[in-house]
Regions:
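Bacterial N-terminal signal peptides
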Residues: 9-20
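Bacterial N-terminal signal peptides that target proteins for export
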Residues: 1-11
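Generic structural signal for short, solvent-exposed loop/turn connectors between secondary structure elements
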Residues: 20, 42-49, 129-131, 209-212, ...
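Serine-hydrolase catalytic core recognition
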Residues: 263-264, 322-325, 330, 336-338, ...
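Beta-propeller folds
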Residues: 23-501, 505-506, 523, 527-530, ...
């Protein structure tokens, strides 16, 4: 076959490329065995590697879990007395839980990862074996105290096939579903709400309901209703989720919604588990350019029944309106207007007595306003942060207007900037606490130290007026801090990809180190052959900006050999994706064991750097930072002769699937082979919120310019496309349209269609085919004939990405 070839359970067939003889020893069965064993090889060998601490309510005590030889221990620390001890008698608890559950347990093999202290710390609760358990620490008795929460999963499934609970998590990266961040925030769900819902007024006298698409009130406990509106209809209805009473119960605001287009994606599940015949299903799924719901705020005066429709001059073309939020003194309510195209974001305040609206804050970037919340999450964050101080008389707001993500203090009465709080060539990553009394902000930031990794997270405190900037963490690494409830103490856990975690207890007042809690011990890991990734930087396309990445080599690395290179790509603009914190298991390592050097870096267009760095993605997702990536590769090759950039492969999932195929289409002179899983190959086919955020609205030629479908004819190298049949994140048709375009262009390619799989299409078969594809096309070695071999070990997952 010289067209699209469906892969089910057979090895890949293709022309063998010419490969230097020095590499012929790579890609052997022994290499596969090492790759398959990588998941479990280092399990339990990292000692004292802590990840997080948990403060106990409003106390000065906290607990954490740490790995030790033979298992794990729970540790309890009192910050006042500096006493550190086991959180409980592990052997006694294991005996009690064994007796109650019928499971054989030891003190170091307790199956739960998390505990909650209850009953004044005289007992602990945890979830295990499908139930919630309570264990008394006085007599070490355990009993079931309830069912496990719905969807709770105490440990990963036996294989890496995504489950219903975790099918949007692949290789530690969270994929956002089409419903998250979509166009409404409760108020614009597009459907009239059932009459049974009611919203009580703060004074307890009234209940607001929706009946026949209109707003009604009734005395609490009564059935007789009073109509506040009569202009609602099936095509222009009021929504219950938007109802907001003023705190003094004199006013009520609700949104009247004109529904947009209800697009659906259709699925045919070919091989359902519960029946022989296929199943058809649909899913609501808005796409770029679709007509959206349009919300109209309406204010009602309860005493007079007066209705005021708010003039929409300040919000004429909404992508979304946030639900109304009242000032505590009922003088006004606010909502946030996100204009279609994301080039105008506005905080609007409305006087309920007059219905007059005014703009308090305007964000009008030339490119896009990243409207998702400022989270502190390396891989998923936006810019939007708002904190209303003193009932909105001041507002703390995040903006990139000076070219970097910083905090500003607004006068909530005049709408004018009082002062910029943070400033400099670095970015605020999250706000942890706002202390109105002391007028201080506790926040996370990165990039403040020239020459250091600009993605490392550090913690700071600053005054509202921008003075008193104080660093609470200073050690070179990425930090994760948890504060006691009174902000008197903090636990600082920090690491790097090449440095095991260090956990310290410090005092906020003077940052004094009170107790070194743990220091990761890697001696056993090192004896077993573990090696950390190498951090590598190179200058990007502008000749001045550093591009940061990591290099992963096989554990049997031989510098006298030539190694083909495989790039793990995810270039979604919602975050940055090269690992910064320590991890024992790096799934890129398994792929490297086959005889490759595997790398990952963040090119321009990703987040957590300057606005200019981020803006490269605007209307240009096809760029994916490739100019920077290729320069980075060339810099590595210039330093290391064994780094063979004549044989570069690339793989990715979701937006990484789009980019990996895009690398083949737009840079065929550099990338020779790609595996693209669950790709959103044409941004007109994918979910509206993610794609319009970066590609803009209205749709234009720039969408086609970035489309892998429209550019499929450019394919020169070897491409494996993976499509999950039941992908609820990316429309499976996105991949199939690429296949169609490749067939029409008479381009050879490979296709794996995975029945029943959701986003990421995980599982050993998918991973093994990725291995085989690169072994075949980059090493020039024929993979094993798996049909004739026993299925010895499940491969580690090798997909990555986010969206």
């Amino acid at each position: 076959m010289n067209r699209g070839r469906l892969l089910c359970r057979f090895a890949l067939l293709s022309l063998i490329v010419l490969i230097p003889a020095v590499a012929r020893a790579q890609g052997t069965m022994a290499d596969y065995d090492r790759a398959f064993a990588m998941r479990n090889k280092y399990q339990g060998l990292g000692i004292n590697i802590t990840e997080r601490s948990y403060w106990i309510d409003a106390t000065s005590r906290f607990w954490y879990r740490k790995p030790v030889k033979g298992g794990n221990e729970f540790i309890l620390v009192d910050a006042d007395t500096l006493v550190k001890k086991p959180a409980f008698d592990h052997e006694k608890l294991a005996a009690a839980l064994s007796s109650a559950s019928g499971q054989k347990l030891t003190g170091l093999s307790l199956p739960f990862n998390s505990i909650t202290f209850v009953d004044s710390e005289r007992a602990i609760q945890f979830i295990e074996f499908g139930s919630t358990w309570t264990c008394e620490l006085s007599d070490y008795s355990c009993k079931k105290s309830g069912p496990a929460p719905a969807g709770f999963q105490s440990r990963p499934p036996a294989d890496d096939t995504p489950s219903e609970f975790d099918n949007d998590v692949v290789d530690g990266v969270t994929y956002l579903s089409p419903q998250q961040g979509q166009r409404g925030q409760g108020a614009q769900d597009g459907r009239p709400n059932p009459d049974s819902q009611k919203e009580a007024s703060p004074d307890g006298k009234w209940e607001a309901i929706i009946q026949n698409f209109n707003v009604f009130i009734r005395p609490k406990g009564k059935t007789e209703t009073i109509g506040l509106s009569s202009d609602g209809s099936e095509g222009n209805y009021y929504t219950f989720a938007s109802i907001a009473w003023s705190p003094d119960s004199k006013y009520l605001v609700a949104y009247r919604v004109r529904p947009g287009y209800r697009r659906q994606v259709h699925y045919v599940e070919s091989s359902p588990a519960d029946q022989l015949q296929p199943k058809h299903s649909t899913r609501d799924y808005a796409k770029p350019g679709d007509a959206l719901d349009v919300a109209q705020p309406v204010v009602f005066v309860i005493e007079t029944r007066k209705q005021t429709v708010i003039d929409n001059a300040l919000f004429p073309n909404p992508y979304s309106l946030s639900n109304p939020s009242w000032r505590k003194d009922s003088r006004a309510f606010t909502f946030e207007y996100n204009q279609r195209g994301h080039q105008l974001y506005r905080i609007i305040e409305v006087d309920p007595a007059t219905g007059k609206a005014r703009a308090l804050i305007n964000e009008e970037p030339q490119t896009f306003f990243s409207y998702r919340p400022l989270t502190g999450n390396l891989r998923e964050t936006g810019t939007r942060y708002r904190n209303d101080v003193n009932d909105g008389r001041e507002i703390i707001w995040a903006s990139e207007r000076d070219g970097w993500r910083h905090l500003y203090l607004y006068d909530g009465t005049t709408g004018k900037v009082k002062n910029q709080i943070t400033r400099g060539n670095w970015v605020v990553r999250a706000v942890n606490k706002v202390d109105e009394e002391k007028r201080q902000i506790w926040f996370e930031a990165s990039g403040m130290y020239p020459g250091k990794d600009p993605y490392f997270t550090y913690y700071y405190r600053i005054n509202f007026d921008g003075t008193g900037l104080t660093a609470l963490t200073e050690a070179e690494g990425t930090h994760s801090v948890s504060y006691s409830s009174d902000m008197k103490y903090y636990v600082d856990m920090w690491s790097r990809v090449d440095l095991a975690p260090i956990a310290e207890l410090r005092r906020v007042e003077d940052r004094k180190l009170l107790l070194e809690l743990e220091k990761g011990d890697l001696s056993e890991l090192t004896k077993a052959g573990w090696r950390p990734p190498e951090v590598f930087t190179a200058v990007g396309r502008d000749g001045k900006t550093d591009i940061w990445g990591v290099i992963v080599r096989p554990t049997n690395f031989d510098a006298t050999k030539k190694y083909p290179v495989i790039e793990n790509i995810y270039a979604g603009p919602q975050g940055s994706f090269t690992p910064k914190a320590f991890s024992v298991v790096n799934q890129m390592q398994a792929l490297a064991e086959l005889g490759f050097i595997v790398v990952q870096m963040d090119g321009m267009g990703t987040a957590n750097r300057s606005k200019a760095f981020h803006d490269v993605a605007w209307r240009n997702l096809g760029d994916a930072g490739f100019q920077d990536r290729i320069l980075w590769h060339r810099a590595v090759a210039a330093k290391y002769p064994y780094y063979d950039i004549s044989r570069v492969g690339i793989y990715g999932t979701s937006a990484g699937g789009q980019s990996s195929t895009g690398g083949m289409l737009f840079h065929p002179e550099f990338y020779k082979a790609a595996v693209s899983n669950s790709g959103c190959h044409d941004n007109r086919m994918d979910k509206i919120w993610w794609n319009e955020q970066w590609m803009g609205w209205p749709l234009g030629p720039h969408y086609a310019a970035s489309s892998n479908v429209d550019n499929a004819y450019r394919l020169e190298g070897n491409l494996l496309l993976v499509v999950p049949e039941m992908d609820t994140n990316v429309d499976p048709s996105s991949t199939l349209q690429v296949v169609n375009a490749l067939i029409k262009a008479n381009k050879n390619h490979d296709l794996l269609f995975v029945p029943g799989a959701n986003h990421g299409a995980g599982g050993q078969h998918t991973t093994r085919l990725l291995y085989d594809f690169f072994v075949h096309h980059l090493l020039g070695v024929e993979p094993p004939d798996w049909n004739k071999l026993p299925n010895k070990t499940e491969p580690a997952a090798a997909t990555t990405g986010q969206q």
